[in-house]
Protein backbone atom coordinates (compact mmCIF):
# COMPACT_ATOMS: atom_id res chain seq x y z
CA UNK A 1 0.00 0.00 0.00
CA UNK A 2 2.85 2.37 0.83
CA UNK A 3 4.47 1.69 -2.53
CA UNK A 4 1.17 2.44 -4.29
CA UNK A 5 0.80 5.76 -2.47
CA UNK A 6 4.37 6.64 -3.39
CA UNK A 7 3.64 5.94 -7.06
CA UNK A 8 0.51 8.12 -6.97
CA UNK A 9 2.40 10.92 -5.22
CA UNK A 10 5.22 10.77 -7.75
CA UNK A 11 2.78 10.76 -10.67
CA UNK A 12 0.92 13.75 -9.24
CA UNK A 13 4.17 15.67 -8.80
CA UNK A 14 5.14 14.98 -12.41
CA UNK A 15 1.73 16.11 -13.71
CA UNK A 16 1.82 19.30 -11.65
CA UNK A 17 5.33 20.03 -12.86
CA UNK A 18 4.06 19.81 -16.41
CA UNK A 19 1.54 22.58 -15.67
CA UNK A 20 4.29 25.08 -14.81
CA UNK A 21 5.03 27.58 -17.57
CA UNK A 22 8.65 27.53 -18.73
CA UNK A 23 10.79 30.44 -17.54
CA UNK A 24 12.64 32.28 -20.30
CA UNK A 25 16.41 32.15 -20.09
CA UNK A 26 18.74 35.02 -21.01
CA UNK A 27 21.44 34.80 -23.67
CA UNK A 28 19.41 32.68 -26.07
CA UNK A 29 21.70 32.09 -29.09
CA UNK A 30 18.78 32.42 -31.49
CA UNK A 31 18.17 36.04 -30.44
CA UNK A 32 21.85 36.97 -30.23
CA UNK A 33 22.89 39.89 -32.47
CA UNK A 34 24.01 38.83 -35.93
CA UNK A 35 27.27 40.51 -36.88
CA UNK A 36 28.06 41.27 -40.52
CA UNK A 37 30.60 39.13 -42.28
CA UNK A 38 33.85 40.94 -42.84
CA UNK A 39 34.57 40.91 -46.59
CA UNK A 40 38.05 40.44 -47.90
CA UNK A 41 39.66 43.75 -48.87
CA UNK A 42 39.65 44.44 -52.57
CA UNK A 43 42.99 44.60 -54.26
CA UNK A 44 44.10 48.19 -54.72
CA UNK A 45 44.38 49.34 -58.30
CA UNK A 46 47.32 51.70 -58.32
CA UNK A 47 46.85 54.66 -60.59
CA UNK A 48 43.02 54.54 -60.47
CA UNK A 49 40.96 57.30 -58.90
CA UNK A 50 37.99 55.02 -58.08
CA UNK A 51 38.72 51.94 -56.00
CA UNK A 52 36.40 48.90 -55.83
CA UNK A 53 34.59 48.55 -52.50
CA UNK A 54 34.74 52.26 -51.62
CA UNK A 55 31.94 53.52 -53.81
CA UNK A 56 28.72 55.05 -52.44
CA UNK A 57 25.62 55.93 -54.39
CA UNK A 58 24.35 59.48 -54.29
CA UNK A 59 20.83 58.16 -53.66
CA UNK A 60 21.67 55.70 -50.88
CA UNK A 61 19.77 56.31 -47.63
CA UNK A 62 20.67 55.33 -44.09
CA UNK A 63 18.01 52.65 -43.74
CA UNK A 64 19.08 49.17 -42.70
CA UNK A 65 19.44 46.74 -45.55
CA UNK A 66 22.47 44.59 -44.73
CA UNK A 67 23.13 41.79 -42.25
CA UNK A 68 24.11 43.27 -38.91
CA UNK A 69 22.33 46.60 -39.44
CA UNK A 70 20.07 47.87 -36.66
CA UNK A 71 16.32 48.50 -36.90
CA UNK A 72 14.02 49.86 -34.19
CA UNK A 73 10.59 48.21 -33.99
CA UNK A 74 7.80 50.15 -32.30
CA UNK A 75 5.47 47.80 -30.46
CA UNK A 76 1.80 48.62 -30.82
CA UNK A 77 -0.08 45.37 -30.33
CA UNK A 78 -3.70 45.11 -29.24
CA UNK A 79 -5.67 41.89 -29.26
CA UNK A 80 -9.06 40.97 -27.85
CA UNK A 81 -11.07 37.79 -28.02
CA UNK A 82 -14.41 36.67 -26.63
CA UNK A 83 -16.15 33.35 -26.97
CA UNK A 84 -19.40 31.96 -25.60
CA UNK A 85 -20.58 28.39 -25.93
CA UNK A 86 -23.61 26.59 -24.59
CA UNK A 87 -25.02 23.12 -25.04
CA UNK A 88 -28.01 21.23 -23.73
CA UNK A 89 -28.97 17.63 -24.42
CA UNK A 90 -32.20 16.12 -23.13
CA UNK A 91 -33.58 12.66 -23.74
CA UNK A 92 -36.79 11.08 -22.45
CA UNK A 93 -37.80 7.49 -23.01
CA UNK A 94 -40.79 5.46 -21.86
CA UNK A 95 -42.19 2.06 -22.78
CA UNK A 96 -45.13 -0.04 -21.52
CA UNK A 97 -45.57 -3.73 -22.22
CA UNK A 98 -48.91 -5.34 -21.50
CA UNK A 99 -50.03 -8.96 -22.09
CA UNK A 100 -53.75 -9.62 -22.42
CA UNK A 101 -53.41 -13.37 -22.82
CA UNK A 102 -50.72 -15.99 -22.62
CA UNK A 103 -51.28 -19.27 -24.49
CA UNK A 104 -54.96 -18.45 -24.63
CA UNK A 105 -55.36 -17.86 -20.86
CA UNK A 106 -55.31 -14.81 -18.64
CA UNK A 107 -51.82 -13.88 -17.41
CA UNK A 108 -53.02 -12.93 -13.93
CA UNK A 109 -52.05 -15.45 -11.26
CA UNK A 110 -52.74 -15.63 -7.59
CA UNK A 111 -50.25 -13.73 -5.42
CA UNK A 112 -48.89 -16.10 -2.74
CA UNK A 113 -47.96 -13.10 -0.56
CA UNK A 114 -51.46 -11.75 -0.48
CA UNK A 115 -52.91 -8.73 -2.19
CA UNK A 116 -54.01 -8.56 -5.81
CA UNK A 117 -53.20 -10.89 -8.63
CA UNK A 118 -49.77 -10.88 -10.24
CA UNK A 119 -49.64 -9.36 -13.73
CA UNK A 120 -47.24 -9.94 -16.61
CA UNK A 121 -47.38 -6.29 -17.63
CA UNK A 122 -44.04 -4.40 -17.59
CA UNK A 123 -42.80 -0.90 -18.33
CA UNK A 124 -39.86 1.45 -17.94
CA UNK A 125 -39.13 5.16 -18.22
CA UNK A 126 -35.97 7.23 -18.13
CA UNK A 127 -34.86 10.85 -18.32
CA UNK A 128 -31.39 12.21 -19.09
CA UNK A 129 -30.34 15.86 -19.25
CA UNK A 130 -26.89 17.31 -19.91
CA UNK A 131 -26.23 21.05 -19.87
CA UNK A 132 -23.02 23.04 -20.19
CA UNK A 133 -22.06 26.71 -20.53
CA UNK A 134 -18.65 28.28 -21.10
CA UNK A 135 -17.38 31.81 -21.57
CA UNK A 136 -13.88 33.12 -22.27
CA UNK A 137 -12.71 36.72 -22.63
CA UNK A 138 -9.14 37.86 -23.18
CA UNK A 139 -7.49 41.17 -24.05
CA UNK A 140 -3.84 42.17 -24.38
CA UNK A 141 -2.01 45.43 -25.05
CA UNK A 142 1.72 45.81 -25.66
CA UNK A 143 3.36 49.17 -26.40
CA UNK A 144 6.98 50.22 -26.44
CA UNK A 145 9.99 49.78 -28.69
CA UNK A 146 12.85 47.35 -29.18
CA UNK A 147 15.96 47.62 -31.35
CA UNK A 148 16.92 44.48 -33.26
CA UNK A 149 19.48 43.47 -35.85
CA UNK A 150 19.15 42.22 -39.41
CA UNK A 151 19.77 38.48 -39.37
CA UNK A 152 19.34 37.72 -43.07
CA UNK A 153 18.43 39.40 -46.34
CA UNK A 154 16.32 37.14 -48.55
CA UNK A 155 16.73 37.05 -52.34
CA UNK A 156 13.48 39.01 -52.83
CA UNK A 157 14.70 41.84 -50.59
CA UNK A 158 12.72 40.85 -47.48
CA UNK A 159 14.69 41.43 -44.28
CA UNK A 160 14.66 38.88 -41.46
CA UNK A 161 15.12 40.58 -38.08
CA UNK A 162 15.28 39.33 -34.53
CA UNK A 163 16.46 40.48 -31.14
CA UNK A 164 15.65 40.71 -27.45
CA UNK A 165 15.79 43.20 -24.61
CA UNK A 166 16.26 42.37 -20.92
CA UNK A 167 15.48 44.95 -18.25
CA UNK A 168 16.59 44.30 -14.68
CA UNK A 169 14.19 45.84 -12.16
CA UNK A 170 14.10 45.89 -8.38
CA UNK A 171 11.95 42.77 -8.13
CA UNK A 172 13.04 40.79 -11.16
CA UNK A 173 13.70 40.99 -14.88
CA UNK A 174 11.48 41.88 -17.82
CA UNK A 175 12.00 40.34 -21.25
CA UNK A 176 10.88 41.47 -24.71
CA UNK A 177 11.71 39.31 -27.74
CA UNK A 178 10.71 39.67 -31.36
CA UNK A 179 11.53 37.93 -34.62
CA UNK A 180 9.96 38.29 -38.04
CA UNK A 181 10.17 39.53 -41.62
CA UNK A 182 10.18 43.18 -42.69
CA UNK A 183 9.79 44.82 -46.08
CA UNK A 184 12.45 47.40 -46.86
CA UNK A 185 9.71 49.74 -48.12
CA UNK A 186 8.03 49.69 -44.69
CA UNK A 187 11.12 51.05 -42.91
CA UNK A 188 10.68 54.76 -42.18
CA UNK A 189 13.33 57.40 -42.76
CA UNK A 190 14.24 57.32 -39.06
CA UNK A 191 15.00 53.58 -39.40
CA UNK A 192 11.88 52.42 -37.52
CA UNK A 193 9.09 50.06 -38.45
CA UNK A 194 5.83 49.34 -36.56
CA UNK A 195 5.28 45.84 -35.23
CA UNK A 196 2.04 45.64 -37.22
CA UNK A 197 4.19 45.61 -40.37
CA UNK A 198 6.30 42.66 -39.23
CA UNK A 199 5.29 39.46 -41.02
CA UNK A 200 5.44 36.08 -39.30
CA UNK A 201 6.06 37.94 -36.05
CA UNK A 202 7.08 36.07 -32.92
CA UNK A 203 6.66 38.45 -29.98
CA UNK A 204 7.38 37.40 -26.41
CA UNK A 205 6.83 39.51 -23.30
CA UNK A 206 7.62 37.77 -20.05
CA UNK A 207 9.58 38.19 -16.86
CA UNK A 208 10.98 36.69 -13.71
CA UNK A 209 10.82 37.68 -10.06
CA UNK A 210 8.16 38.33 -7.46
CA UNK A 211 5.74 40.14 -9.79
CA UNK A 212 5.87 37.33 -12.34
CA UNK A 213 5.41 34.73 -9.59
CA UNK A 214 2.45 36.62 -8.11
CA UNK A 215 0.59 36.47 -11.42
CA UNK A 216 0.91 32.67 -11.60
CA UNK A 217 -1.56 30.38 -9.77
CA UNK A 218 -0.24 28.05 -7.09
CA UNK A 219 0.39 24.36 -7.67
CA UNK A 220 -2.92 23.36 -6.05
CA UNK A 221 -4.87 25.92 -8.10
CA UNK A 222 -3.22 24.63 -11.28
CA UNK A 223 -4.43 21.13 -10.40
CA UNK A 224 -8.05 22.26 -9.93
CA UNK A 225 -8.13 24.17 -13.24
CA UNK A 226 -6.23 21.55 -15.21
CA UNK A 227 -7.93 19.10 -17.62
CA UNK A 228 -7.13 16.34 -15.10
CA UNK A 229 -9.81 17.62 -12.69
CA UNK A 230 -12.70 15.14 -13.09
CA UNK A 231 -15.55 17.50 -12.16
UniProtKB/Swiss-Prot annotation:
Chief place where the protein resides: membrane
Descriptive protein name: Flagellar L-ring protein
Lipidation (S-diacylglycerol cysteine): 19
Xref: HAMAP family: FlgH (MF_00415)
Membrane topology term: Lipid-anchor
Covalent lipid adducts (N-palmitoyl cysteine), residues: 19
Cited function: Assembles around the rod to form the L-ring and probably protects the motor/basal body from shearing forces during rotation.
Any GO MF annotation of the entry: cytoskeletal motor activity
Subunit structure: The basal body constitutes a major portion of the flagellar organelle and consists of four rings (L,P,S, and M) mounted on a central rod.
Gene Ontology annotations for the cellular component aspect, listed alphabetically: bacterial-type flagellum basal body, distal rod, L ring; cell outer membrane
InterPro entries named in the record: Flag_Lring
GO terms for biological process, alphabetical: bacterial-type flagellum-dependent cell motility
Signal sequence range: 1-18
Lineage: Bacteria, Pseudomonadati, Pseudomonadota, Gammaproteobacteria, Pseudomonadales
Amino acid sequence: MKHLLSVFALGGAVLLAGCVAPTPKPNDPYYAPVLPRTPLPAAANNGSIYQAGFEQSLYTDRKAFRVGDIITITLNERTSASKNAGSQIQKNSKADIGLTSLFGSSPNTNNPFGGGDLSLEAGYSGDRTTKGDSKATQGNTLTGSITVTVAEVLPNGIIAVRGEKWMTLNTGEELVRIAGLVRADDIATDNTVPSTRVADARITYSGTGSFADASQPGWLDRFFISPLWPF
